[in-house]
């Protein structure tokens, strides 16, 4: 049971966009959770792109991290997939909307990588955080 990568296979080559102002990358990575950090979470889950509400100021914070030389990696548990509530494509739509909303507010708020664990807690997957 391994983790999954948004819109690509886990083993695919990761193509990174340039950091702002042509800054060189020194290997710094900011690992961020999604629900409750970037967007408002819900006990009933964020079930579709229309339900996604980005927390105020988050896009600027992500942009500032990138302007400071950090790559942004989102790590998130997404057990609704393992519970059968929705599929990987639904999650890809939610993540596309997250990316769109962040970039709408700050052109540098690029998410370099999103890793997620689709398994339910009782699956005892090591990829759950």
Task: Give the role of each language-model region.
Residues 43-60:
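Basic, amphipathic juxtamembrane/active-site segments
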Residues 48, 52, 85-89, 129:
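Charge-dense, low-complexity intrinsically disordered segments
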Residues 58, 62-95, 110-126:
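Substrate-recognition element of Asp-dependent hydrolases with the DxDx(T/V) motif
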Residues 98-106:
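Conserved hydrophobic residues forming the short capping helix/wall of the S-adenosyl-L-methionine
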